[in-house]
Amino acid sequence: MEEFQGYLELDRSWQDDFLYPLILQESIYALVHNQDLGFNRSILLSKKKGYDTKYSLLVVKRLVIRMYQQNFVILSLNHSNKNAFFVPNKNLYSQRISEVFAVIAEIPVSMRVMSSLKGKERKQYKNLQSIHSIFPFLENKFSRLNHVLDILIPHPVHPKILVQTIRYCVKDISCLHLLQLLLYEYCNNGITLKGSVSNFSKKKNQRFLLFLYNSYVCECESIFVFLRNRSSHLRSTSYGAFLARVYFYLKLEHFLKVFTKHCRVILQFFKDPFIHYIRYQGKWILASRGTFLLMTKFKYYFVNFWQCHFYLWLQTRRIYINKSLNQPIDFIGFRLSVRLNPSVVRSQMLENAFLIYNGIKKFETLVPTMSLIGSLAKEKFCNVLGHPISKPAWADLSDSDIIRRFGRMCRNLSHYYSGSSKKGGLYRIKYILRLSCARTLARKHKSTVRAFMKRLGSEFFEEFFFKEEKVISLILSRDSSISRRLYRGPIWYFDIFCIHDLASHND
């Protein structure tokens, strides 16, 4: 990174074209490859066909040479089937450039983030990026609120609007022209910006699409900037490697001056709403202690804002008003709800006794058992009713590999759903995986499940349970065996940054 420092000086004007030259550096392509898949010199230098061809240094050199040509941009803009740069079946060059563009465009944002964080804030920033960092906040705040807005982010987005959005963080004109070129190419190939980022995981240019999506969502969230001035309890979380969240807060001073000067009526309308706000992937949740009428006004204000600012026709049915989470909401793989726990207190005053009935709101995070069973059925671990079946695709693996893969899935699920209020659904999912593993092994050895499990004994369950117990023991000291036995509260982890597919078997 030392050779790029000349381009990354903070005191340089944002109008200077200091980002585009990085695209012409061969080292930046190796850096992107290192971030995505782990640096492997043998792959970069390989000339074989297949997977490693995409990351060959020879391909990179040819790409850079073509970009130095004077008629390169003209040929690219006048796209035709004869153009060797953008060919529908051979879009290797455009894929490489899009990945590098995403990394380079994140540089100004990441530099602002690092310059704004100091001391402990920088150490705690990584923990705040964790998915599980949302739930302690929800437990402390949401149980005291009255209404919740469940919002689906509007989509799709026109390429010109995306370019205008990214202009707020990238001032390099050359990069913006290149971005416009790439966007029109992806639109011609049928790639559109969906409302859910999970759809991007199946695309080859995942980093580029994530960057576009987060830039767009960050601009959509500009409506919440002046609301944060009215309520200091606003919280928000980012998704993926994009660091737009802090950049969103850095725009506060400018927006507050504008809204205070020109939007006094709006500020009075939203006076002290006591708002809590979180976002993940394609969904927003906005909670307030205000009345139902106030939340309805919020709903139509959002619709008008997105329609006027982004030219998006957002239907009101995409925004749901939930009264204090009486109806569960699906969010980040959990089902969120607030349950009223009744309690009775007996009061004795002289000869008179009174019974006082109190209701205490308790925030619950439940495991979506039926959704998980549907995912397992789709991956052929069980049927639609939840009855375990064998996994034929893994029957050719060794016994240790089969047990290791099933065990890893159980540990990942236990890790992610460690903070759930009720573990019954999680135990059912683990039972399905454990019995599916036994059926797969029995199918491989042409034996019955009972005979095979009897032969393995307790060693078969070690992969599923013991390693999970070791993780818990790191949190609760081994010396405090009584506290570990009595503790029944949720355990949240701050090392979970994305949700992997259930069938993932990568280390």
From Swiss-Prot:
- InterPro entries registered for this protein in UniProt: Domain_X (IPR024937), Maturase_MatK (IPR002866), Maturase_MatK_N (IPR024942)
What GO terms in the biological process aspect are recorded for it? mRNA processing; RNA splicing; tRNA processing
Q: Which GO terms describe its molecular function?
A: RNA binding
> Domain of life of the organism in this record?
Eukaryota
Give the principal location in a single coarse category: plastid
Keyword list, A-Z? Chloroplast, mRNA processing, Plastid, RNA-binding, tRNA processing
Subcellular location as annotated: Plastid, Chloroplast
**Its GO CC terms?**
chloroplast
What PANTHER family does the entry give? MATURASE K
Q: Which family does it belong to?
A: Belongs to the intron maturase 2 family. MatK subfamily.
Q: What does this protein do?
A: Usually encoded in the trnK tRNA gene intron. Probably assists in splicing its own and other chloroplast group II introns.
Q: Which HAMAP family match?
A: MatK (MF_01390)
Q: What is this protein called?
A: Maturase K
Q: Which organism is it from?
A: Fagopyrum esculentum
